[in-house]
Amino acid sequence: MRRPVTRRFPYRAAPLAGPVLAALALAIGFVAHGGPLRADEKAGLAGSGVQIVPRDAAFLSASLKLREQYDRIVGSNAFAALKKLPAVARALESFEEQRTMPGSPFSMFETFMELPENEQAADLVQDMVATDTFVYGEPSCVSFVKLLQTLQQAQQAAGLIWDDEPLLELEAIEPDPEQDTPEDSVGVRAVLRPVALRADAAEQFAPGQRQTRMVVEALVANLDLLVVPDLVWGFKTAKRDVGRSQLKRVEVLAKLLVQANPDLENALKRRTVAGGEFVTFTLDGGLLPWDELAGQVEEMAGDVRGAEKVLDRLRSLDLVFAVGMVGDWVIITLGDSLDHLEKLAFQDPAKGLLSTPPFAPLRADADKPITAVSYVSEPLAEALATTPDDLGEAVDSFSNLVAAAGLPAAAERDVRRWLQRVRDEFGKRLPDPGAWMSYSFFNEQGYEGYAWDWTRNLPYDGARQLEILRHTGGTPVAVAVQRFKSDPRLLDAVVGVVEGAWSLFTTYGRPRLDAEEVDRFDAFEEHLVPLGGKLADVLRNGILPALADGQVGLVLDAKTRTKRLHDELPASAELLPLVEPAIVLPLADRKRFLGGLNDLFALADETVAAVRRMDPDVLPKGYEVPEPKKTKVEGGTVWSFPLAAAGLDDQLQPAIGVGEDAVIFSLGPQQVGRMIAAAPLETGRRLTRFNEPLAAAAAVDVEQFFDALAPWVRYVARYASVQERDGEVDPDAELSADDENEQTREALDHVRVVFEVLKTLKVAVVETAFRNEALVSHWRNVIRDLPQP
């Protein structure tokens, strides 16, 4: 049996592209510059972890000013409010009781920590994480990531192979007619037992066996990627003497542990590396039970050619763990040696990561109170991304999978041609991965930061303003808008790929279906497939040309109110905000879009008729697509589709709004009416510069979000309280504060305080634009403490 070549498949996670929306914010325009570090640039980050990390690091994550951030939190009125909550107070009282109870684990731990050497260790740990910490990976991490992805892809490939025949010949064992059958048995099933291996069983594998075999084959084909990734953690401390004392203590304790095992006699050593003292523990790869593991793998996967090379490689790899001090840094590392520590730029900052081009923006902002820095190198970004080369490898890999599936030889040829078309059409559209760097810092209102992405061939357009921000409703809970580059051939490319896939299935998949499945397939092809072509024509000739450009906006709001969401739910004494998601698109040709919209409505009617011809019973008798309700509003027209049969509030209706320069799709006509008329975006307005050329923009009103969520929390809590009291909830009832029991009232009071604390993060915004050949996201948030009680 032919098996697929174990290559790298294109299923990969995309590299980080910017900060998370919940932390977004904007600020002043910022342009990074290169060149040597000026004196004022060096001052803020001189001697920092970012400066001493080697310039070839694969990734970096650094946290600074953690003690200051911690002090800000625990010293806030918000934190004090949380501590006063009854549940928190009870938990603290219980902890204090356990802490002072003789013989309790907490009491024993506290007694242990009162020893002078342990107090020193605790103080050292607190100091280590107070001001500057980092973790980075050496280039070996790139190889390790590639290996992990290769193994994952081998597992996925194994799952795509199927066999029509079992591995064993079976015979049925009929039950003994004289054997008593349990009275409660509904029937007796014949038992199957294996009597012999199939003649070709040597070439057949069960799913688990096949997966193991393909993983081993992947290891054999990628021995160069089989490495121990070198990782380094660094912690800056002002307690050098305590650090040296604790290092000696670690060495003594480690010696006691290794003395119990003769194989580890030479594993523990003290070494001088990078100008510092390290205690190292080396686990010789040859001492690990690889032979035992190899036997288990061979039992599962059979004899895989080259598997011995994998074992030899594993035996040659040492695992080295070390902890030590270099100057005022506690360094911990895990890898195959300590050689990489010699690259730490303690003596020559020019050899550090901070001096490289991606960190030019950070160098320019080095005088700011930096709180965090993250970095992904271009090689690691490329390892994590899907590239055109991956699509090329996938052509061979999937073609081999087709061959392994037992399809005709022509199938492999046709599938290869189809995959090559996919590669040609979409490979040129894939981004070309580049380095990524971000950092954050304190500002007068909260946090602020930048993310710089040097990925090339991105599909975004940042040459103009995002005009559809004027059609987001003014003060939505959240909004995110992005402009994509125009790609007139994309629809035709997608249609061509889908048609090719359908043709392949028709030619090679249909003959493998049973008679009933063939009938369903033929009916689908006769009645519904032609409608797919009509849909493509409507999009190609009507909808897409009518849209102005590549802007796409997502809006979340909650201004429409209801007292009863559904007929079968009780009403609420207070109004409940309805969740209102919407999509907004720019419009260039209103008349053409309306023509395309009418064609879509007609196509929906054709689809219902086609489905009914396929199976008259699949739809309710007499069902037709509801006629939309047309309403004139300020700025345009709204078409809404009532859902009377669903029992939902009448305000919940799918709706389409068409204005002069925007189209809105929503679940509520009221929201469409608010959005269709142009109005300035007020959410986060004081922080933003959304009137500049941007590729993307987003804003979140955190306070408004929790204000909308709170009534629903109270409604659900009251519903649960009535359910507990009466055993059921009358749909005709109205839930109010009178329905709350004592437990519910206390829980809701806790929720109220927690929401007030969460609302101290008032708003977050982000702007994304192209600057200096990079996609730059600039974010800012506003944090306001609770008032003094």
Predicted features and spans:
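Bacterial N-terminal signal peptides
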Residues: 17-32
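Short cationic amphipathic helices and targeting signals
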Residues: 59-61, 227-238, 322, 328-333, ...
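A cross-kingdom feature marking solvent-exposed beta-strand/loop segments within repeated
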Residues: 44, 260-319, 621-653
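Extended terminal
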Residues: 39-41, 45, 50, 428-429, ...
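Structural boundary/hinge residues at secondary-structure and domain interfaces
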Residues: 40-230, 234-294, 372-420, 453-578, ...
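Sec/Tat signal peptide C-region and signal peptidase I cleavage site
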Residues: 33-39
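A conserved glycine-rich beta-strand in the N-terminal activation segment of trypsin-fold
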Residues: 311-397, 401, 649-731, 735-737
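N-terminal secretory signal peptides that target proteins for export/translocation
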Residues: 1-16
